[in-house]
Amino acid sequence: MFFKVDEEIPRWSAVTWAILPKWSTKCGQQSFIIPDHQLGYMHNEKSEGNNSKILVIGLGQIGYSNAEYMTSMGLDVDGYDVSESAVMRALDAGVIRNRARNFEGYDYYIICISTHNPEDMSMPLQDGIFQLAEKISREGKPGALVGIDSTISRGTSYRVLDILNHRLHVCHVPHRFYINEKQDHGVRQTRVVGACDSCCMAEAKRFYGEILDIPLFEVSSIEVAELCKIVENSYRFLEIAFAEELKMMCDNSGVNFKELRDAINTKWNVKILDARDGIGGHCLPKDSQMFLNNTKTHVGLSIIEAAKEIDLKYRMHIRRKVEQDTHMQVQSQQRV
C-alpha cells in the first residue's frame, strides 16, 4: 500500500510509527510503503469530541484559565507545570483532573508557558518552548495537535515542528486573555489562528473552533499569527509611551495633562491613554522587545527603541515627582 507525498494519512498508533519505514516531508504528510502483513497495525487513535484527552502545559494565569474553560465544557483536561504550587492550585480547584507525569496518550498539547526571561521580564526567552517540544517529541502521540498559546517570536513554530520531526501537528493561536475583564476578554473571544500546514490548520480549527467554540480569524501563514500578538502589544506600548511623553511635557511646562487629554479625546478618531506607573507586566515589555528584534533586522531603525527610552525616562520622572511631593509634605508639616 502506498500513500502519496501530498496525501494526508491516518494518525496511527505509536507502535505503527515505530515499525514503518518513513521519510519526513510536511507535517502529517509522509510517504510510507507498508507491507500487507503490517496493515493490521493501522488504526486512527484520535479520540472524538468530548473523549479527547487534553494536556495544558503551564498552569499560570493563561494556562489555568484555559484549563478552567475546557473543564467547564466537560472536557478531559490534565495539567503540567514545573511549579508544584501551580499544579496543586489547579487540582484543588478542580480545574484539571490529573497532574501529568509524562506526555503519553494525549490528543492535544496546549502550551501556555511564559516566554520572558525570569531574571528580566522585559526580555524574551523561549528556551522553555523548545524544551517542551523535545519532551513532546519523545513522549507525545504521533498525529496529535500541539497548540502554542504562548507569545512567541517569528519562526518559532517551524522550529518546534522540526524538533517534533514533523510527526505532530503544530498551530499558533496567541492568547488574548485579560484577567481584569474575563467576561469580555476571556478564553472565548476572537483569536487569530495560524498553522504550519493545511493538515495542521484543519486540526487547529477542529479543536479551537469546533470543540472549544472559540471564534477564529484564520491567517495564511503561521508567521502572520506569530507576528500578530507581538505587534498588538508593541502598538499598545507605543500608545502608552506617547501618553507618558505628553504627561512629562505637561508636568515640565505647567500644563494640566488631564484637561489637555480630555479635550483632545473629544475628537472622534483620537484616543490618548492615561499615563500611570510606567509600562510593566509580563507582556508589553517582552513582546515589544520581540518586535524590536525583528524590525532591527529588517528595517534598522525602530520607534519602539525611542518608546522604551521614553518609558524609562517617565519612570524616573514620576519617581522624582513622588520624592518632591514627599519633601514638600514634610516641610509643610514642619512649619505647622
Locations of regions flagged by a protein language model:
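NAD(P)-dependent Rossmann-like dehydrogenase/reductase catalytic/cofactor-binding core
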Residues: 2, 12, 23, 32-52, ...
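Internal alpha-helical scaffold of NAD(P)-dependent oxidoreductase catalytic cores
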Residues: 35, 40-46, 139, 162-173, ...
